[in-house]
Amino acid sequence: MSSPSSLTQRNPTSSQEQSESVPQLRRQTSQHAVMSQTLTSAANLANLLPTGTLLAFTLLIPVFTSNGSCDYPTQVLTIVLLTLLSISCFLSSFTDSVKAEDGNVYYGFATRKGMWVFDYPDPDGLGLPNLSKYRIRIIDWIHAVLSVLVFGAVALRDKNAVSCFYPAPEQETKKVLDIVPMGVGVICGMLFLVFPARRHGIGYPVTGDGGRR
C-alpha cells in the first residue's frame, strides 16, 4: 500500500499534466472552430454569385457533361457553357437596381456617367433618382474579377465538371483540384468581406439605398 508521502509526490505531477493539457485542448478547439468557420464560408461562396447564373450552372452542367462522361464534342460544349456563365458573372457585377417614384424597381447597367436603365418606360428618365451615383467605380471591377474566380471555384468543386475534363486524375492532380478551389474560394470570400458589394443588380437581392456610395 502506498504511503501518504508517495501520494503527495504524485499529485503535483498529475496536476501539472492536467494544467498543461488544458491550454493544448483550448488551442485544438480554437483550431477546429476556425477550420469549421473557413469551410462554412467556402460552402457559402455560391451566395456571392447571381442566382440565375448559379441556377443555370446547376441545371445545365449535368446535361452538357453527360453526368461527367464527356467525349470531345461535349467537352467543347461544356467549355462554351462555362465561358458564357463566367461572362454572365462578370457582367452581372455592373448591373444595379433603382426604385422609381412609382414604387417599382427597375434594373440597369452601370456606365462611366451613371446608369443606363433598360426597362424604364419613360426614355427621358422622369421619375428616376439621380443616376450619377450609380456610375462604375474601381470596386466594381474588383467584384467582377472576384465573381469569375468564385464561379471557377464552384465549378471545380462540381463532380460532373471535374469528371468531364479529368475522368481519372492522378494523385497530384486530384490534390490540386481539391486544394486550389478551396483556397481561391476562401481568399475571394475574405476579399468580399473587405470590399462588400453595394450594388443590387440582376440576380442579387434588392435593398434600400442606405448603403449606396
From Swiss-Prot:
Keywords associated with the record: Endoplasmic reticulum, Membrane, Transmembrane, Transmembrane helix
Segments crossing the lipid bilayer: 45-65, 74-94, 136-156, 176-196
Topological type in the membrane: Multi-pass membrane protein
**InterPro entries found in the cross-reference section:** DMP (IPR007770)
What do the Gene Ontology cellular component annotations say?
endoplasmic reticulum; endoplasmic reticulum membrane
A GO biological-process term: plant organ senescence
UniProt similarity note: Belongs to the plant DMP1 protein family.
The identity of this protein, by name, is Protein DMP3
The organism named in the record is: Arabidopsis thaliana (Mouse-ear cress)
The organism's lineage?
Eukaryota, Viridiplantae, Streptophyta, Embryophyta, Tracheophyta
Source gene?
Answer: DMP3
